[in-house]
Design a protein with these regions (language model features):
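Gram-negative (and chloroplast) outer-membrane scaffold detector with strong preference
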Residues: 59-130, 190-200
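Predominantly the C-terminal beta-signal and adjacent terminal strand-loop region
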Residues: 38-42, 80-86, 152-200
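Hydrophobic alpha-helical segments of small multi-pass membrane proteins
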Residues: 98-100, 118-123, 138-148, 163
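Cleavable N-terminal export/targeting peptides
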Residues: 1-24
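Transmembrane beta-barrel domains of bacterial outer-membrane proteins
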Residues: 21-27, 33-35, 39-41, 52, ...
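Short glycine/proline- and aromatic-enriched beta-strand/turn motifs that initiate or cap beta-hairpins
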Residues: 19-67, 122, 191-199
Length: 200
């Protein structure tokens, strides 16, 4: 009898956990307005700094899964993101990246369709600087930010957010006879995003 009751208790607990921990795959697309803040630092025989700042548009696509908990949701996704070229005088910077992101959506309860969220991501970034010559390289890309989701139906949600994004620091060294130069590139962006998500 005790074994039967214990087994019944385990089954009930598993059922309760299953109902409290559900997940659904989703696809998402976002448009963004990015305040590109790119810096080049030169050291060696010559020293100096240059900033290539511009405001550009961009976009991203993502696939992921939402894990529904009792007091909020976790979202895990793989995202590809790209910005339009940031230009200044005769130079321009191209940036793109692939990120693995983790978000937490806060449930405000009381049937409110708004869910604030925070999130961070880590992945691969690529930047290309074109001017008198061309320099391009890959590096570690990171993002951190937050925003709010608006659930318009069971499957669709709008997303309004902000994030600080890095596209991978890298450097290049040059030797011209006795002249040595090292250029350090730091592509950054403050990004404001508007997106839509479809959850299956």
């Amino acid at each position: 009898m005790r074994k039967t009751l214990l087994l019944a208790g385990v089954v009930c607990l598993a059922a309760a956990n299953a109902s409290a921990f559900e997940f659904n795959p989703y696809v998402a697309a976002k448009a963004k307005y990015a305040l590109a803040r790119n810096e080049v630092k030169v050291t060696g025989s010559y020293e100096g700094k240059a900033k290539l700042n511009d405001n550009v548009f961009g976009g991203s696509l993502a696939v992921g899964s939402t894990y529904h908990l009792m007091n909020g949701d976790f979202r895990f996704e793989l995202e590809y993101t790209k910005n339009a070229d940031a230009k200044k005088r005769n130079a321009k910077v191209k940036t793109q990246g692939v990120l693995f992101n983790v978000y937490y959506d806060f449930d405000l309860q009381n049937n409110i369709p708004l869910k604030p969220y925070v999130g961070a991501g880590l992945g691969w970034g690529r930047a290309e600087l074109e001017g008198n010559g061309s320099v391009k390289d890959n590096g570690v890309s990171m993002q951190i930010g937050g925003g709010v989701n608006y659930q318009i139906s069971e499957h669709f949600a709008f997303d309004l957010g902000y994030r600080y994004m890095t596209y991978g620091d890298f450097d290049k060294e040059y030797h011209f006879g006795p002249i040595y130069e090292k250029d350090e590139y730091k592509p950054r962006a403050h990004e404001f995003l508007l997106g839509v998500r479809y959850e299956f």
